[in-house]
Every structure is written in C-alpha cells, then in structure tokens.
Amino acid sequence: MNNQTLEQNITAYINGGFIPIEVKPHIINNLNPKFALRPYQNEAFSRFNFVLNQYNQRKKPTQLLFHMATGSGKTLVMAGVILDLYEQGYRNFIFFVNSSNIIEKTKDNFLNSLSSKYLFNETLSIADKQITIKEVDNFEIANQEDINIVFSTIQGLHSRLNTPKENALTYEDFEDKKIVLLSDEAHHINAETKKGKKTKDEVESILSWEGTVNKIFNSNLDNLLLEFTATADIEHPEVRKKYNDKLLFDYPLKQFRKDKYSKEVQLLQAELNQFERALQAVVLNQYRRKVFEKNKINIKPVMLLKSKTIGESKSFFTEFVDGINNLTPATLNKIRNNATNPIIERIFNYFDTQNITISNLILELKGDFSEDKCISVNSKDDSVEKQLIVNSLEDIDNEYRAIFAVDKLNEGWDVLNLFDIVRLYNTRDADHKSGKVGKTTMSEAQLIGRGARYCPFKLDDTQPLFQRKYDDDIENELRICEELYYHSAHNPKYISELNKALEQIGMKSIKTVQKRLYVKDSFKDTDMFKNGVLYLNKQTVYDRLDILELDKSIKDKIYNKKFLT
C-alpha cells in the first residue's frame, strides 16, 4: 500500500473490514438531531477517527483534506469533528475562509441556537460536563473548558498576525497550545501551491496567506490543519502532489448525485427577451409552489436572477419589479403560446384544471413577487442582515422569492429551496482552439451544482427525506419538486457547452450507449430511416418472487361454467 494515496489506503482498510463505519456517541448526541447523519458522513467521521488514533503512518503536525461535494454537509462534518477533538483534549480552533459572507453564515450556524441551521444540540455535554461554544479574538484569555473559535477570512488572519494589535491574535498565542485550523472552501489557500517552482527570493521573503497558515500549523506538533472543499483541483499536478498523503475522504458531486442527494438539473432555453424569460421562470416557480401546497408540503420555492454586471443587475431589478406590477394577460398568454418545452404547456394546463384563470394568476404573481419580496445582493457593502436573509430563505417567516445577483453567491450559499436560475445574458466564452469549456461556463455549472442541493420532503415515513424519490416516475407531479431549472436564451452552442461542463463536474451523467440494430435494406431507403428516430425497448427480467397469491382481480371475478347432466 506504500505507493497508494492516503485516501486509497483508508479505502482498502474499510473494504477489508479493518475500519468499522461508526460514529462516537459524543458526536451524535451533541449535533442537532434534525440533521440526521448520512452514510457518507458516518464514513468521514470513521476515517478521521482512524487516522487520528490508529494510523501508524500519520504525520505530525497533521494536515487532512475532506473533499466533499457541494451540498453534502461539509459544515456538519466540521461541527462533528470539533466535538470529537474536544473530547480528545483540543480547545482552540481557528475557522478561516476566503469570503466574509461565509464567515457570517458560519457564525450563525455555530453560535446562534435560534437559527434554523444551528448545527449543535440545545445543550452540549461531553464526559458528563456541559460545554459552551464561544467566539474569541485570541486564546490567551479564553476559557480552556470551552470550545474557543476565532472566525476570520484568510486575508484577515494574515493581516491580524503580521500587523499585530492590542488584544489581537499573535503568533505567540500558538507557542504552547494545540491549535486546530479549519479551512472552509480550502482551495483558496493553494495560491502558492499552484505556482510550482519559485525563485529564491519568493521562497525566502514572500508573506502570503498560505504561508501564514503554514506558520501557525507548524508551531506545534499536535496541531491540525483540516481542509474542507468541493473544488480542491486535485488534478492540478502541484496540488495532487501536495495532497497525496493528505486526502482523507473523497465524495465527489458525481457520487452525491448518483446517491440521489441532489436535485436533477434541467436546462430550459427559450426565444424570449430577458423579462419574458424571467417571467417564464416565475410561472414555473409558482406552479411548483402550488404542487407543494396541493401535497400539504410547506416549502416556498425561490429563484435566482443572474446578470453579468452589477449595473445590469440593478437595471433589471427595476425592470422586473415594473414588469410584475404591470403584468397583463397578453404577456402571460405569449409565454403560453410560444412555449417550446412540454413543461410550460403542462403548467398552464394544470392551471386550467384547477380553475386558476390568467387574471387570478396575475394577482398571485403580483403579490408573491412584489418588490418587497425581491432582494438584490450585489454590493460589497451589503449588510450582515442581508447576508443572513439570503442564507435563511427556507425559514417560514422569510417571504423573499427572487434574488438578484452577479457572482455574490458563488460560494458559501447553501439555500435548499432554490429551484430556478435565470441567466440574463447571452455571451459564451468557449476555448475554441482547445475545445475546452470556458471559465465563465464552468463557473455557471458550479453555481448550478451549488443550487442543486436537494430540498427535503416526504409524503410519508416510507419515503427517504433527503433523497430523490421520483426519478423513475416521470408522470408524477412532484418530480418537478426534485428538479432545478436553468433558464437561458435560445443558444444551442452555449447549452451544448454547459452540458459538457455539467458532465465534467458530475452534475449530469453521460448516457451515450452504443446499440447494434439490424434492419432491412429496403428500410434504409425510407425517409423514416434517414430523418426519423428509432426507439429500442429495454427488456427487464420479471422474476415474480414478490408474487405470493393470485391477483385480487382474478380471485374476485365470478366465472360461469355449464356442465352437461
């Protein structure tokens, strides 16, 4: 096993039955019970416990990477790891990330017991001792019976340590203490790693974010650097080399989707102007709300309207609000009559069967998508309150339906009830020479991946709460409640490129299968063969093992038979 990566080694141990998949009681009992641990999260905890306490090739100080798909619950795993490390004597933690938005969201998840996304139980108790989680500025005056966490951006951490102030964190804080560094969206600390070879001056003198982190990390042999990300760029030669003995757990988006923990993605292109395209998404979004309500499920779908620039986003916000306020039957009828996708026809037919007139629908949309239920998150100076609003869109008392943004929400946005994304520009940036997916398209695919977190619901206890249920039931109206729609202008080349990007990140499967069909030569000369489509039935073996008695229709039927006497 010496030539294998750490992740491969641990996988071999698990497959050989040497590592049981189990979670310690002090983790289970102290996490919020409404967040039921999933099998892959249990495996992550088991891997971590093994490496920390039993793996004889463990290096000290220890650096480990949890490479987990967007939406797979990395932060919950992080919370469980903190509890586990407290039980093993660790008290001081530094949580750092690239974005201040994620800092505020994480503080809310870790510290605010009233938050709907609070990660811990109401009371925390380890070894019959109640403990508290506290935010601190430094560790010198922190209570060493508490879980003490410094929250900082990477840039802020670098600045605080290299330009020290009174009562602030300093390098001296780490000299005699065991520190756990928790890095969320950890791919950002690899800025220097990707440079490859550096000049002598760079090696000796550059103060960087990555350098600051490593200086803290190496100050004590018992320190831990735990990285969490969905996009570590493991294929980059320098990054792959760096993480060869550090990658602890790899649960990619492809497997996450295959295990049915994500929404399915649908691409909907239309020959409509920007407002009409957004309106079509509004109609679809409202239909989905009605399907939820019909099935007595209290979920409010929201939508994201994505512009290319902040100026365009602000301008369209005004256009959208005015368009909804002045909505007419003619505009909605245009959406209906020009629809090229069956889902739009299905929606309007549903409204007809439910006796929802166009006039009544307009009144609904004017109320549900009014200006006070739309929010723009484009400014660098957005308030903390605004950040918390967009991270609590699932809350019952949060009535926002439409979010307008450029790239403010590209990382750290973990809203579950996002069901529609509207692309409000038509450009594409494919690398025509190499045939590679362009950077913009790839970032859009990654945004779709973040938006495809599954919004949990079930009709009864026989159904899984956190997984898709209707993949094979294509006529079920609830299927649309397990789908994320991405709305764009009609641009086949862009859609083709986006599909390619989604396949690369694992959000769409490649379903090309070659089949050999034998047809008569005479059939090859027909228009059907030249221009039509051939369908091949898939045979499924019916083993009849679940049949224990005659069908009721046979048992209850009265059979008449005449006998000769």
Regions found by a protein language model. Name each.
Residues 34-60:
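N-terminal pre-P-loop "Q-motif" helix
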Residues 71, 97-98, 229-230, 407:
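Conserved H-loop
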Residues 20-34:
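Conserved adenine-nucleotide phosphate-binding loops and their immediately adjacent elements
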Residues 58-81:
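Walker A/P-loop
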Residues 96, 182-183:
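Generic enzyme active-site microenvironment
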Residues 90-96:
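Conserved catalytic segments around the Walker B and adjacent sensor/switch elements
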